[in-house]
């Protein structure tokens, strides 16, 4: 049984004061999350502030990126050791914006996954196709290649500690969302590949999140799919009321 994970990626939004206000709003309305995990990933500058607020609460702390070395002359980089020191439990790796804007490739992303694991951080590996790739019928090929490139050479135990986030690039910040059926089909494919690499028993335990214009009005239908185990939420995580509605999604039996 996989525990749903609802993760908020704040991207390059929120000053420390704004971060405090948002977290206080989340904590005020969170209530009993039951069988769900809640995660927020603020910008680096707000990590300490958010850590101090969420410590001892159901909200976990994550970062949006990490470098591959524990320390050294890497100006502007943040190491996994530093993230652990700040209380982070998770880190996003390979987000489509890191791939497209900052030129990160599969080799570097794979190294970041390994660096996170080596320092007891849970990496959230992001994979997904662009609109031209999807229109050309290559979506599955692209996503499978990204998963394999990042995880090749890892042991089943290592792969079992990773979270995958499927984020169709064409849906991020556009208001467009993959239909629940389309998202489920890709999640099922990802789980099959994870099974090929780590065994079906391990694959069955791995959380595969959906990311791409997740909103309060589509979360219930997405979470009704058998292989969608949570969401990586962008814009809708920047307001307490919308993220809380996502956290408290209605499961099919409700």
Swiss-Prot record:
Signal peptide: none annotated. One of its GO terms (cellular component) is cytosol. Pathway: Carbohydrate biosynthesis; gluconeogenesis; Carbohydrate degradation; glycolysis; D-glyceraldehyde 3-phosphate from glycerone phosphate: step 1/1. Gene3D superfamilies: Aldolase class I (3.20.20.70). It comes from the Bacteria. One of its GO terms (biological process) is gluconeogenesis. This is Triosephosphate isomerase. The gene is tpiA.
